[in-house]
Regions:
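Nucleotide-state-sensitive switch-loop elements of NTP-binding domains
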Residues: 2-5, 33-97
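A generic secondary-structure signal
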Residues: 26-27, 31, 79, 141-145
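Preference for solvent-exposed, low-hydrophobicity sequence contexts
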Residues: 199-210
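Conserved catalytic-core segment of NTP-binding enzymes
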Residues: 96-192, 196-200
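A conserved segment at the C-terminal end of the G1
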Residues: 19-39
């Protein structure tokens, strides 16, 4: 499998970004038997990914006096641009969403990614319920960011808070994906299995920072 650079980004908190990060990293490690995975966590508030010992994630310090400092992203991107033999999975908290997008724009990062050997993906989560509109807005901002570049979006549809739907039609069944096929490289559905036992197991897994 080709090495890749993966950012998990969504401006809405509590939608499952760190869960998606853990699942993605485990997929690379267990299903593809890759031992060149670099996992990072930029969240200055909730270092959820760092707590999962098996992922051996690095805490990427991007704050100073409780403020996100854009220049602190520099070492992370330098590592990505100079280590094509690695696959990167970077978990980003809600508070880093806008600063990181600003960093992308200010430093022409999309242009830089045109020259890297790895594929580059931004993974974003869309949920149902009250947070649907906010997560769709986050998607739209990322869509504008990657438009016209080699960077593609992976949409994670998380049914934990309800099935994301537009006009009572599940998002996955609407023309949403087709309409945005120029920027979407794939879709992952985190299904609501409607099982108390399954939900309890997942809750215990995440609370104890375990892997599958």
């Amino acid at each position: 499998m080709k090495n890749s650079i993966n950012f998990i980004l969504q401006g809405k908190g509590g939608v499952g970004k760190s869960f998606a990060t853990a699942i993605l990293a485990q997929y690379f490690i267990d299903e593809n038997h890759m031992d060149n995975i670099v996992v990072g966590d930029t969240d200055p508030v909730n270092t959820t990914t760092v707590k999962v010992k098996r992922l051996n994630a690095d805490l990427i310090q991007i704050t100073e006096n409780s403020k996100v400092i854009q220049s602190k992203f520099d070492p992370m991107f330098e590592s990505m641009l100079t280590n094509s033999q690695n696959t990167f999975v970077i978990d980003n908290g809600a508070s880093t969403f806008l600063p990181l997008i600003q960093y992308f724009n200010d430093n022409c990062v999309m242009d830089m990614f045109e020259d890297v050997e790895q594929d580059v993906y931004i993974h974003t989560v869309i949920v149902g319920g009250q947070a649907l509109a906010d997560t769709l807005q986050g998607f739209e901002e990322l869509k504008e960011l990657v438009k016209g570049s080699k960077v593609k979006l992976i949409v994670w549809i998380n049914e934990f808070q309800g099935i994301p739907a537009l006009e009572n039609i599940p998002l996955i069944e609407t023309k949403f994906i087709e309409k945005n096929k120029d920027v979407i490289a794939g879709v992952v559905v985190i299904q609501d299995r409607k099982s108390d036992a399954f939900a309890s197991d997942i809750k215990e897994l995440t609370e104890k920072s375990l892997t599958l």
